[in-house]
Amino acid sequence: MLLSLCSLLLAPTRLLLALWRLVARLGVAVAAVAAGVAYGLWGLWVLLRRGPRRTFRWRVRDQPPPGLADGTFGEHRYLHLKDSGLRLHYVTRGPPTAPLLLLLHGFPQNWFCWRHLLQDLGTRYRVVALDLRGYGASEKPPGRDSYRLEVLLEDIRQVIEILGPPPVVGEGPGGHRGPPRLLQVYLVGHDWGGLLAWEVASSHPEMVEKLVIMDAPHRAVMAGFMACHLSQLLRSSYIFLFQLPWLPELLLSLADFELVRTALTSSWLGIQNAAQRLTEQEVDAYLYGLSQPGGLTPPLNYYRNLFRDTPIPREPPPLPTLLLWGAEDAFLDARLVPCLRRCLRPTARLCLLPGAGHWLPEDQPRPVARLLDHFLGTGDHHH
């Protein structure tokens, strides 16, 4: 009788939640169609401007450009995840006994975006720049389900477990050996890597010593902010485009990946620091993997799983956190920063870099390296 009464009382709440999910899904579907039309018109403009031959021709890069696959920036290695057996590629530099600094890239990049930090911090830390699954030289399992958010988070957890320092046995009262204590790592994420880093640090704070986030929103903040700010909805229009099948792959490939090039190199979307603008070879370091047959689909599947019902951690990471943000970020509204600051612990640090865009590790490599070195080198570890 009591169970029936409880079920009856909860029925309106269940109905409201079901309606809310339906409305949210309809909203995403409408936004995806609208974005598809808008970007489709851009594709038509490219066709009229360049003609069919140049528009529908894209070059598969046969050889990696200098720096991508050689040892210029560090040693190339692979690891196998314990559960899935998936092989992930990473580049490492620094003393093997130094603290582990794990770097997670975003879209549409790969480990190469961390090349400056590998050089600048590789003398004091064991720096590891990972290729996330589906990117670069890491394996690219087929199917959208292989890129669910919970799968990606588990990848990072296992990478920390494999590459991090081994547990040490502590000494308890009276000199007795205590339980193993996990030695932690420094976790740094940009863009998609930052989104993953937020949630790994929240769900596994015992594995992370300090957290650094660069131009990456927390899911708990982003949804509400986007609903209240039309400007962010427009800046994020590509996210809705990526919900569609095949069309994003086609549009991103047009005119030898013109849209990707524009995002990385244009004066208003790309790197703001003129001294750090990407060369043709540096752009090819990203296009090399994306241009391979099927190379665009795995990164886009990250976005296609973004609106699934994956639980969002509501509590901010308990560990020391540094939030770095480019003041001229073209993809993320600057008003997001105070919203993110409010969801962090009072001890968290925030640094807004004037004149910097979204691609912070390449836009301002020297200031970013100094800020990281100072933050990681201070002694404010959590207890």
Model-predicted regions and their roles:
Residues 115:
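A short, exposed helix-loop element centered on a Lys and neighboring polar residues
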Residues 109:
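Glycine-rich NAD(P)-binding loop of the Rossmann-fold in SDR/ketoreductase-type enzymes
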Residues 356-369:
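Catalytic histidine-centered segment of alpha/beta-hydrolase-like enzymes
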Residues 2-80, 88, 93-101, 112, ...:
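Flexible "cap/lid" subdomain of the alpha/beta-hydrolase fold that forms the substrate-access gate
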Residues 83:
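ATP/NTP phosphate-donor binding region
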